[in-house]
């Protein structure tokens, strides 16, 4: 495995819609492994192929919540979603900044694993947020397109340390404010009333920490 260079905004590849993977071979599996190594080295909890300069629909995710669960997903797609929650996010491709982003609270992701088997992943809280953030990367969308209160990391370095640790950084106790971003808010309003959810928290003690169950076809 190799540690790859993480490309930074305004790299063009970050704004392209990534191409689906049509053949799973040794090079795809190696890329997944290299992305995993790069994610851990960053360190982060998620990474999408465009972030290492490859415009393919691949993501790797490890919420690092003590479960030991690593997701290496090919052509991931969100097929179900419900609820809204606001959290603070950072991005390895946009260092030094954080912002508040409304996301679905629960999602179901369908994808292929590294062997080509179809998997369904039901995720909520932190894990659901990571999946949404990484899948956005595959469509050329950055969290800054959706966020409010975009800001530099704090001078004391606490936010900076967290932002470097996590591709997605939920804020422990954010105050409720505003509404979901215009993108997708209309649909969410019809489905869930677009009400602000309880804030996702970080750390082992977080009540809304992500959880998931995966099933294979």
From Swiss-Prot:
Pfam family, one: Pep_deformylase
Binding residues for Fe cation: 91, 133, 137
Biased amino acid composition, Basic and acidic residues: 206-217
Region feature (Disordered): 153-217
Main enzyme class: hydrolase
Cofactors named for this entry: Fe(2+)
Catalytic residues, chain numbering: 134
EC number(s) recorded for this UniProt protein: 3.5.1.88
Keywords: Hydrolase, Iron, Metal-binding, Protein biosynthesis
GO MF annotations, alphabetized: metal ion binding; peptide deformylase activity
Family that this chain belongs to: Belongs to the polypeptide deformylase family.
Matching HAMAP family: Pep_deformylase
Function comment: Removes the formyl group from the N-terminal Met of newly synthesized proteins. Requires at least a dipeptide for an efficient rate of reaction. N-terminal L-methionine is a prerequisite for activity but the enzyme has broad specificity at other positions.
Name under which the protein is recorded: Peptide deformylase
Name of the gene this protein is made from: def
């Amino acid at each position: 495995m190799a540690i790859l260079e993480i490309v930074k905004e305004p790299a063009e590849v970050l704004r392209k819609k990534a191409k689906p993977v049509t053949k799973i071979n040794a090079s795809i599996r190696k890329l997944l492994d290299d992305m995993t190594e790069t994610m851990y080295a960053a360190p982060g909890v998620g990474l999408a192929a465009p972030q290492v300069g490859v415009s393919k629909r691949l993501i790797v995710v490890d919420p690092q919540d003590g479960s030991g669960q690593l997701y290496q997903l090919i052509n991931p797609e969100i097929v179900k979603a419900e609820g809204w929650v606001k959290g603070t996010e950072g991005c390895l491709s946009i260092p030094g900044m954080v912002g508040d982003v409304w996301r679905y609270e629960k999602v179901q992701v369908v994808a292929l694993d590294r062997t080509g088997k179809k998997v369904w992943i039901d995720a909520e809280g932190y894990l659901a947020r990571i999946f949404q953030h990484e899948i956005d990367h595959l469509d050329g969308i950055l969290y800054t397109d959706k966020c409010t209160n975009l800001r530099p990391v704090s001078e004391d370095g606490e936010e900076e340390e967290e932002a470097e640790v996590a591709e997605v950084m939920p804020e422990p106790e954010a105050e409720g404010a505003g509404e979901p971003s215009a993108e997708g808010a209309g649909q969410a309003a019809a489905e869930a009333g677009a009400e602000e959810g309880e804030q996702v928290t970080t750390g082992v003690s977080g009540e809304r920490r992500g959880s998931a169950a995966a099933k294979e076809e």
